């Protein structure tokens, strides 16, 4: 078993990077890959950079060059579910683009031409994520739709648009749908496991910067427990 782990920012991958034994670092096309082992499991940790293009590029390189059996996307997200607070976890059941619109050609809002409207997370990986959650006391999680766009969602207008068109959304962020679409095209199982760094209807830019370290700690703990369970 080789596990690919993807985070966008240095803060989102730092904890896991420090746990990799015999780490080898490779920089390519703006992406940084850290390969080695965590608790005897082969892992490749990718710091992709922010946004959908960087995430898709990095995921394609990860899959084509390192051939992971599964991909886990980690990091932070903005909470949309009413029960979520900073530090809570979201597990993807499916992922969609919230900033794609080719409805003029008969596609659903968020659906790209020639692609499914939603990218379904792997059932086994979702189960493993929930098993990991059960072993982390005092960690609250919600499983559901995660929406992605190349924008930091911090205005009431954009929040309203997303809620209107994707009423079941539990969280938003800036890379997951690109990772999911790339995994779909390569036929590699994926799941998104992120922690909440800020919550809709609150001071987004300030709270994101303030609470990102807590989100990184929560999401990294989930991924580490998943690695143990996937041995």
UniProtKB/Swiss-Prot annotation:
Its EC number is 3.2.2.9. Catalyzes the irreversible cleavage of the glycosidic bond in both 5'-methylthioadenosine (MTA) and S-adenosylhomocysteine (SAH/AdoHcy) to adenine and the corresponding thioribose, 5'-methylthioribose and S-ribosylhomocysteine, respectively. Also cleaves 5'-deoxyadenosine, a toxic by-product of radical S-adenosylmethionine (SAM) enzymes, into 5-deoxyribose and adenine. This is 5'-methylthioadenosine/S-adenosylhomocysteine nucleosidase. It comes from Vibrio cholerae serotype O1 (strain ATCC 39315 / El Tor Inaba N16961). InterPro entries: MTA_SAH_Nsdase (IPR010049), Nucleoside_phosphorylase_d (IPR000845), Nucleoside_phosphorylase_sf (IPR035994). Pathway: Amino-acid biosynthesis; L-methionine biosynthesis via salvage pathway; S-methyl-5-thio-alpha-D-ribose 1-phosphate from S-methyl-5'-thioadenosine (hydrolase route): step 1/2. The active site is at 12 (proton acceptor), 198 (proton donor). Substrate binds at residues 78, 153, 174-175. It catalyses: S-adenosyl-L-homocysteine + H2O = S-(5-deoxy-D-ribos-5-yl)-L-homocysteine + adenine; S-methyl-5'-thioadenosine + H2O = 5-(methylsulfanyl)-D-ribose + adenine; 5'-deoxyadenosine + H2O = 5-deoxy-D-ribose + adenine. One of its GO terms (molecular function) is methylthioadenosine nucleosidase activity. Pfam families: PNP_UDP_1. It is an enzyme of class 3 (hydrolase). GO terms for biological process: L-methionine salvage from methylthioadenosine; L-methionine salvage from S-adenosylmethionine; nucleoside catabolic process. GO terms for cellular component: cytosol.
């Amino acid at each position: 078993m080789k596990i690919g782990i993807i985070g966008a920012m240095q803060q989102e991958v730092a904890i896991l990077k420090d746990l990799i034994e015999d780490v080898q670092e490779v920089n390519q096309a703006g992406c940084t890959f850290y390969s080695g082992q965590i608790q005897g499991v082969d892992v490749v940790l990718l710091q992709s950079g922010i946004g959908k293009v960087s995430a898709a590029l990095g995921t394609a390189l990860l899959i084509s060059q390192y051939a992971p059996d599964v991909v886990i996307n980690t990091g932070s997200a903005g909470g949309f579910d009413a029960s979520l607070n900073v530090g809570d976890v979201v597990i993807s059941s499916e992922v969609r683009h919230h900033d794609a619109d080719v409805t003029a050609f008969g596609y659903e809002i968020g659906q790209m031409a020639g692609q499914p409207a939603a990218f379904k997370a792997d059932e086994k990986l979702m189960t493993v994520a929930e098993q990991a959650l059960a072993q982390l006391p005092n960690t609250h999680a919600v499983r559901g739709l995660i929406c992605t766009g190349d924008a930091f969602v911090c205005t009431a207008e954009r929040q309203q648009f997303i809620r209107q068109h994707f009423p079941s959304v539990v969280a938003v962020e800036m890379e997951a749908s690109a990772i999911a679409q790339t995994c779909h095209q390569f036929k590699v199982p994926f799941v998104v496991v992120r922690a909440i760094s800020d919550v809709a209807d609150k001071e987004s830019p300030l709270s994101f910067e303030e609470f990102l370290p807590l989100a990184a700690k929560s999401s990294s703990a989930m991924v580490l427990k998943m690695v143990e369970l996937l041995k």
